[in-house]
Amino acid sequence: MIEVSGVWKIFGVEPEAALKAINEHNLGKAEVLEQFNAVVGVADVNLSINRGEIFCIMGLSGSGKSTLVRHFNRLLEPTAGSISIEGTDVMKLGQTQLREFRNRKIGMVFQNFALLPHRSVLDNVAMPLEIRQVSKNDRMRQAAKILD
């Protein structure tokens, strides 16, 4: 069984502050972007998927489907919430345990493994660092070094 409870993902420099403002002042996505320069990728998702159940996550392009699923194996870390898979609290796993969990309990096939055409080669190479929230200067320096 997969259980997801209260999962949020906010992309930006201060995601926790943005989430606090959302909860305290009922801010919408546009207000979060304007006030915190942050993007709400996943907003308060709750779901349970039983073993063997066929479960469909549907939505428009860019609505957060893949972002949500990437939390199941912690390719993305949620800003808030909990995720449990077959009784294992995924959020409490250390790096070694997480690798073992990914190897034995969960897999993922990416929907698109090509370069992103709207990004430069440098930006494509730097993207994994962006996801890890490395500063722009550091990720550009590291990506340029790799490409050199």
Set out the residue ranges of the language-model regions.
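Short coil-to-helix segment of the ABC ATPase nucleotide-binding domain corresponding to the Q-loop/switch region
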Residues: R119-A126
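The feature captures the beta-strand-to-loop junction immediately N-terminal to the Walker
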Residues: M58-L60
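Helix-to-loop junction immediately C-terminal to a conserved catalytic motif
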Residues: N73
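Conserved ABC ATPase "signature" region
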Residues: K20-E31, E86-D89, E130-Q133, N137-D148
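Conserved coupling/switch loops of ABC nucleotide-binding domains, chiefly the family-specific signature
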Residues: T79-S82, D138
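ABC ATPase NBD coupling module
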Residues: V32-N37, V90-I106, I131, K136-M140
